[in-house]
């Protein structure tokens, strides 16, 4: 299990050396990170700092990030004996007096952009079985609570498939005495349980802040709306939400058929990040930084969809059909802790029961070697689609799902084999330019055909849960 140490930092330029005491380790240092690092020996360290540490001497935001990163790295090299670290520069807000310039530096934007940006950056770096150590000692104002929320949100998704432990630290407050001993306390030490409560993705990825000149708002929004990748993302919305729903509601066939790969989602995320950064305006003379855009909940949900895709992908199970054996594998891995997995067990047990007790050998021979609608196997009529019914049957709704029966001889009796496969009726699946649609064509008793967009129904219930 890999050990990761994460720490949000405020302005480290004024930190003084003290003695930090942690579980038998005493370390004289300007940061609590030193003692924790020596004790736990992490594989990787991530330090989150704010762009508010910049001197704002360039109009280019890339220069601002580079400046802050170099400033932080120099502090680490000069004061802390740690290796294998990475500095992540996040957006910050506030007004700060800079003694060197004898001037107030002003950073305007939305405070929650810190959460969104840190969520995005850490989602790319966390994976596998993890032991995450979070040191909140040096976080400024909103940083500790938002960093904790980021870590918790990501780890609860990571725990769907991995073993995850979270340990949180904070030290005694520094009161200005030289050589004083500050104890580092363990605030929390927990095994993270998986959360399947992932929100569906809405279209509020980016919006204009109140700091934009009114005459610029229309231009900025048009720029976002006309962006080809963001336009494509809007079209992909139902596919992404179908994938999220497959995890939330434990729907094996929806997972395998409508899985959206992390690489595809990452392209959209990078495009949104690019739009966000390109609309940061800096006035080096007046020392003012303004963010014209802020991240909405749609962006946060997209990051979580990316992370869920990253941790949940089982390549051999991303396909249009699944055997009963493969469905059981999903039930015991991705959906192991999901309360909705009971529906999977019920449906598969029902199929075994129907085939093994209600079909004679000669009847089975007539349907072997063909894909057969489940409603016919159940000797029932096709029904109009109802989303609640779809979820209650783990996505194996009889009117849209087909079965390819395989049998085996058990003690002289022909029974259903775990090699039996399920899929959605191919006549209802459409794909164009990488976008899938799931359209059920239902004919009522009067012969009238109604087309039902199943992904739309899945999305509606996900967004309204």
Swiss-Prot record:
Q: Which residues form a coiled coil?
A: none
| Sorted UniProt keywords | Antiviral defense, Endonuclease, Hydrolase, Nuclease
Q: Which CDD domains match?
A: Csx1_III-U
A Pfam family that this protein carries is: Csx1_HEPN
Top EC group: hydrolase
- What's known about how it's activated or inhibited? The RNase activity is stimulated by cOA.
Q: Which GO terms describe its molecular function?
A: endonuclease activity
Biological process terms from the Gene Ontology for this record are:
defense response to virus
This enzyme's EC code(s)? 3.1.-.-
PANTHER family from the entry?
Answer: CRISPR SYSTEM ENDORIBONUCLEASE CSX1, CRISPR SYSTEM ENDORIBONUCLEASE CSX1-RELATED
Q: What does this protein do?
A: CRISPR (clustered regularly interspaced short palindromic repeat) is an adaptive immune system that provides protection against mobile genetic elements (viruses, transposable elements and conjugative plasmids). CRISPR clusters contain spacers, sequences complementary to antecedent mobile elements, and target invading nucleic acids. CRISPR clusters are transcribed and processed into CRISPR RNA (crRNA).
Query: Any extra remark in the record?
Result: Encoded in a type III-A CRISPR locus.
What do we know about how this protein assembles, alone or with others? Homodimer.
NCBIfam families with a match to the protein in the record: cas_MJ1666, CRISPR_DxTHG
In the record, the note on similarity to other proteins reads: Belongs to the CRISPR-associated Csx1 family.
Protein known as: CRISPR system endoribonuclease Csx1
Classification from the root reads:
Archaea, Methanobacteriati, Methanobacteriota, Methanomada group, Methanococci
């Amino acid at each position: 299990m890999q050990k990761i140490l994460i720490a949000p930092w405020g302005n480290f330029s004024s930190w003084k050396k003290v003695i930090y005491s942690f579980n038998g380790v005493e370390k004289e240092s300007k940061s609590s990170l030193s003692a924790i690092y020596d004790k736990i020996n992490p594989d990787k360290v991530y330090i989150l700092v704010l762009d508010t540490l910049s001197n704002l001497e360039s109009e280019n935001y890339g220069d601002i990030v580079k400046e802050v990163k170099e400033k932080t790295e120099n502090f680490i090299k000069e004061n802390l004996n740690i290796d294998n670290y990475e500095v992540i520069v996040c957006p910050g807000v506030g007004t700060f007096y800079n003694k060197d310039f004898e001037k107030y530096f002003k950073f305007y934007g939305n405070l929650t952009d810190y959460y969104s940006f840190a969520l995005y950056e850490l989602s790319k770096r966390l994976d596998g079985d993890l032991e995450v150590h979070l040191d909140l000692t040096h976080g400024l104002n909103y940083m500790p609570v938002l960093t904790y929320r980021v870590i918790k949100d990501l780890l609860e998704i990571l725990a769907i498939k991995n073993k995850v432990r979270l340990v949180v630290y904070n030290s005694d407050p520094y009161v200005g005495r030289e050589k004083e001993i500050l104890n580092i306390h363990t605030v929390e030490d927990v095994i993270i349980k998986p959360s399947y409560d992932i929100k569906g993705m809405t279209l509020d990825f980016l919006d204009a802040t109140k700091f934009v000149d009114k005459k610029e708002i229309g231009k900025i929004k048009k720029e976002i709306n006309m962006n080809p990748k963001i336009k494509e993302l809007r079209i992909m919305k139902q596919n992404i939400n179908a994938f999220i729903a497959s995890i939330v509601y434990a729907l094996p066939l929806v997972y395998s058929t409508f899985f959206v790969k992390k690489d595809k989602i990452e392209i959209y995320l990078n495009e949104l990040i690019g739009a966000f950064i390109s609309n940061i305006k800096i006035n080096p003379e007046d020392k003012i930084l303004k963010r014209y855009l802020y991240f909405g909940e749609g962006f946060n949900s997209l990051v979580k969809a990316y992370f869920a895709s990253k941790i949940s992908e089982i390549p051999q199970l991303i396909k249009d059909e699944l055997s009963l054996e493969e469905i059981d594998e999903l039930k015991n891995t991705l959906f192991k802790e999901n309360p909705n997995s009971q529906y999977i067990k019920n449906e598969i047990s029902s199929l075994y029961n129907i085939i093994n007790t209600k079909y004679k050998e000669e009847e089975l021979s007539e349907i072997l070697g063909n894909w057969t609608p489940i409603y016919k196997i159940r000797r029932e009529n096709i029904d109009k689609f109802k989303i609640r019914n779809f979820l209650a049957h783990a996505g194996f709704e009889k009117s849209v799902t087909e079965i390819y029966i395989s049998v085996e001889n058990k003690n002289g009796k022909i029974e259903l084999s775990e090699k039996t496969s399920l899929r959605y009726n191919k006549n209802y699946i459409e794909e164009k330019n990488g976008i899938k649609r799931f359209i059920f064509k239902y004919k009522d008793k009067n012969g009238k055909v109604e087309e039902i967009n199943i992904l739309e129904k899945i999305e509606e219930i996900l967004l309204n849960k």
